[in-house]
Each structure stands twice: as C-alpha cells, then as structure tokens.
C-alpha cells in the first residue's frame, strides 16, 4: 500500500471521481467525509489541511484520510509544534473518520497509521471519531509505540450535562403517521398533532423552504436568530460564530446539500433549522438552528424538527441524525444513541519529533515568527526561525529574519 499526500485544492479536485466511488462503497462512510462537504471546508481554508491518499500496487485508489493541521506555540516547551485533527472540523463537522474500500480496510488503515507516525506533529486529536470497533483497533494498533501516548478524552457542554460523544438518531419508518405512532410517546404524539393542525389551518403561520431567490435573506435570518439565542452564552464571540455558521450553510445551499426550513408568524421569522442531506447514505443531518425565545404561542423547535422529519420521510430518507449531544428533547422525538470516540495521540515529548515542523506549515510558522518579532518576543521569533530552517534549510525569508533578530539582540547586548 502506497500513501501519497495532497495539500492543494487543485489536487483534491482531481480525486473526486475516485472519492465518490469509495464513498458509495464504504459502509462506514458518513456525510462529513463526502467530497462535497470537504470541498467547501478545504477550499475555504487553504494551507491548513492535508489529505492522505492510499493507493494499491496497481495505483488504484483504496482510501482517504483528510486532516486539519495547526501550528501552535508551546509555552511549556518554548517551541512551535503541530497538531492534527480531522479536516471536517474546519467546517465544524461533528464526525471524523477514514474512508476506505471495505475489502482493503486492514491494509489501508494500517498504512495510514504507519505513515502518520513518520510525520512531524505532537498531538493528534481524533474528536468525534465515528468508526466501528474493528476498524478502530486496526487504525490505532500502530500507535502502541513507546514514542506515543494514547489517551481517551471526554467532551461535554452545558456544565457537564450534555455528552458530546453521544450521537442520537432516529431510524425512520416509511410514513410520517408510522413515525408518530411508533417513535413518540402518546403525550408527545398528541401535542405534536395538535400543533401541526394549528399550523396547517392557520393563515398567520407558514413554513418555508429556502430556494435560490430567498437564500441570502434566509441565511441572514439564521445568523440573526442563532445570535439572539446564543448571545448570553457566547458573549463577544457571538457574531463571529454566527457568521461562520452562515458561511457553512451558504456553501451547503450552493452545493444543494443543505435543507433550510423557516417558521414564520405573519412576516416575522420565529425559527430556522438547517440540515445537510446525504442522498448516498439516506441520512438527514440536523446541523444548526435558531429561534425567537420570546415567542411562546408555539413550541418552535419541536415543530421545526417534526416538519424536518416529515420532509425526510417523504423523500425516502431512512435516518434523521441529530449529530452530537444527548440533549433530552432529541429522545422525546424518538432518538436512540450511537457512541463516538475521542482518543488523543501525542508524543511522549509533547513536541514534534526532532523539533522539525510539518513542511506544509512553513508559511504559517513564518507568520508566527514575524508576529513574535513585531511584539518584541525576540527569543520566540528566533526559535521559530531556527525550527523553520531545520525543516526547510536555506529558506531565505526565515534566514533574513533570523539574521535581523540576531543583529538586534547584539545591539541591545552592547547597550
């Protein structure tokens, strides 16, 4: 098995046909490993990712592992280091994983892990790893090495009340009536039917689905309602986070992978719910929502999810995926759990092997060195330049900056 590294979007685009073929063939493939999802993330963040490509002896494609790379200054070790995550995290994907042909999974997973051990990184965060027990053992086995430490991590929110390594989902029946009868309690079923009837006969309430003509407006509504709902929790970061959600959903709408519902009262939007559609795997994935909490006449969130479930069933979708988080409302709608994994693989030293950086991060490392120099963190800037030169000997920009920093230090030393 031969492993290649791809780190430009042009190269990634050339993989689409093979990627789609393997995606359709892999029973463990999930939407956040699809070419379309990753295309949005990778194109939006050039220079921050790499994709490992597995090819057989006959050069046919056997598997893909998309990764995000970050460059971090370690305060404790006083040097730059690299971290790896699943690349889907660039677009806040809830799941990560490995894509491979099932008949070659053992060779592919082993080859990816062995290749990763040769790269320069200190921490590999496999957050939201969605993978079978069999594949997990195959992938993790090579990291049982004295150079590495493997730690199981947790992921909770809401003061520990919500476990983000639990992923509730609903296996959908053939009809919405069957869903109401089989998946809901009698109390929830009666309440939902009552509110849906009210919605259907009302001239003041309406439910709309985003189309090309309303796309810009509807994404703005999402950002506004999400921000209003989360402002107390997110504080100064609210607008930045809302804008990124809008960017991700906008890309999905352009790619025709996003289904966006809005519930209105007259001309006022009450709530919005954005989901991604995986037609290949027959799955609708709830991604983000917003609502006006001041409106109390209807349970806006419940109605939006119920209408989303109905839309999924009417379009032949077999699974409604709530993604991460075991919030109680998901179970009131008939969800059952799937468990995700979150191992951290890190080097014993806590830094990159031999202090060298991943070659793909040189531009990022140079920017950090320049920033350190501007802020008079001279020693940090010197160390960063030295690491860059250890990785890429002869790099002219790093050498010039290092020479300038040394000259400044000598002048200060004589004063």
Label the predicted regions.
Residues 387-411:
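Short, charge-rich amphipathic alpha-helical segments embedded
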Residues 3-83, 128-145, 151-296, 403-408:
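A conserved beta-strand-loop-helix scaffold within acyl/acetyltransferase catalytic domains
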Residues 49, 55, 72-160, 281-337, ...:
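Acyl-donor binding region in acyl/amide transferases
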Residues 140-177, 319-372, 403-410:
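Active-site/acyl-donor-binding loops of N-acyltransferases
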């Amino acid at each position: 098995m031969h492993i290649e590294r791809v780190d430009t979007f042009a190269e990634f685009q050339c993989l689409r046909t093979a990627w789609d073929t393997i995606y359709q063939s892999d029973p463990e493939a999930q939407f956040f490993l699809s070419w379309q999802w990753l295309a949005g993330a990778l194109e939006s963040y050039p220079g921050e990712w790499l994709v490992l490509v597995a090819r057989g002896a006959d050069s046919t494609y056997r598997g893909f592992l998309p990764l995000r790379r970050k460059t971090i200054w370690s305060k404790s070790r006083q040097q730059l280091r690299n971290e790896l995550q699943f690349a889907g995290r660039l677009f806040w994907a809830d799941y990560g994983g490995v894509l491979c042909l099932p008949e070659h999974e053992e060779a592919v997973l082993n080859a990816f892990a062995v290749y990763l051990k040769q790269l320069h990184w200190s921490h590999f965060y496999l957050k939201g790893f969605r993978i079978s027990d069999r594949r997990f053992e195959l992938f993790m086995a090579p990291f049982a090495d004295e150079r590495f430490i493997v730690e199981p991590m947790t992921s909770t929110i809401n003061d520990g009340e919500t476990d983000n390594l639990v992923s509730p989902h609903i296996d959908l029946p053939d009809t919405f009536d069957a869903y109401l009868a089989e998946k809901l309690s009698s109390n929830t079923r009666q309440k939902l039917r009552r509110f849906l009837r009210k919605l259907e006969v009302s001239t003041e309430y309406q439910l709309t689905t985003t189309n090309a003509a309303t796309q810009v407006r509807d994404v703005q509504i999402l950002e506004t309602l999400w921000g209003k709902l989360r402002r107390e929790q997110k504080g100064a970061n609210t607008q930045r986070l809302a804008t990124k959600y809008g960017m991700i959903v906008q890309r999905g709408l352009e790619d025709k992978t996003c289904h966006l519902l809005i519930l209105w009262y007259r001309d006022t939007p009450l709530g919005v719910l954005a989901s991604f559609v995986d037609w290949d795997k027959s799955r609708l994935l709830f991604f983000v929502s917003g609502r006006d909490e001041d409106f109390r006449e209807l349970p806006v969130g419940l109605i939006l999810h119920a209408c989303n479930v109905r839309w999924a069933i009417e379009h032949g979708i077999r699974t409604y995926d709530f993604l991460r988080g075991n919030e109680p409302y998901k179970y009131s709608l008939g969800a059952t759990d799937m468990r995700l994994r979150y191992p951290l693989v890190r080097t014993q030293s806590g830094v990159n092997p031999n202090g060298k950086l991943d070659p793909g991060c040189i531009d990022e490392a140079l920017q950090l060195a320049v920033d350190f120099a501007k802020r008079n963190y001279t020693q940090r800037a010197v160390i960063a330049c030295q690491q860059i030169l250890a990785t890429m000997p002869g790099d002219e920009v790093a050498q010039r900056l290092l020479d300038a920093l040394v000259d400044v230090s000598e002048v200060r030393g004589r004063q």
